[in-house]
A protein has these predicted regions:
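Core segments of transmembrane alpha-helices
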Residues: 59-78, 139-154
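Juxtamembrane boundary at the C-terminal end of a transmembrane helix
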Residues: 154-163
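C-terminal halves and exits of single transmembrane alpha-helices
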Residues: 79, 97-105, 109, 133-150
Length: 163
């Protein structure tokens, strides 16, 4: 079961990487909504994107990704793995989401954004690092606690539905 959960977590992480790659395929400005306000303002001032485009990209990202991630983990845990009850669902959800969180923090934030040129928006290089040490601490804390809360809420809802 643990190997299965590891693979499902890696699958969710791969989905996140794919979504990021698609978002920056025409340049990192496509995901500027993930950057700090100063980077967004600079991109707008340079005519690379408008405030409205940033808003639309952010909404599209949230509308597609969040339901997609939730559907993925629910299908894995309840349809494929057959979890029933709160505790079996909770720990499986937590493992899968935690693996994705580690991939997001280490592979995407630390390596891809922090050490490659793929996420550089022209004219904003002086605003690097795009993800500061303080951001990283917040993301680790929120990611760790957030995944536990999300897992608990989803497991609770599914325990009620499947009861």
């Amino acid at each position: 079961m643990l190997l299965r959960l590891l693979l499902e977590g890696l699958g969710l992480g791969a989905l996140l990487v794919l979504i990021c790659a698609l978002g920056i395929r025409k340049g990192a400005v496509g995901r500027v909504h993930l950057y700090h306000e100063d980077v967004q303002s600079r991109a707008i001032a340079q005519g690379l994107i408008t405030k409205e485009q940033i808003r639309k990209n952010s909404l599209r990202f949230k509308r597609l990704c969040i339901p997609g991630y939730l559907a993925y983990v629910l299908v894995c845990v309840y349809a494929l793995n057959g979890a029933r009850g709160f505790l079996p669902g909770f720990w499986q959800l937590l493992v899968i989401l935690s693996i994705m969180n580690v991939i997001d923090r280490l592979l995407i934030d630390d390596y891809w954004v922090g050490h490659t040129d793929a996420w550089i928006i022209p004219g904003t290089e002086d605003l690097r690092p795009y993800i500061t040490a303080q951001d990283k601490r917040k993301k680790w804390c929120f990611g760790t606690l957030g995944m536990a809360v999300i897992s608990a809420v989803l497991a609770g809802i599914m325990a009620l539905i499947l009861h």
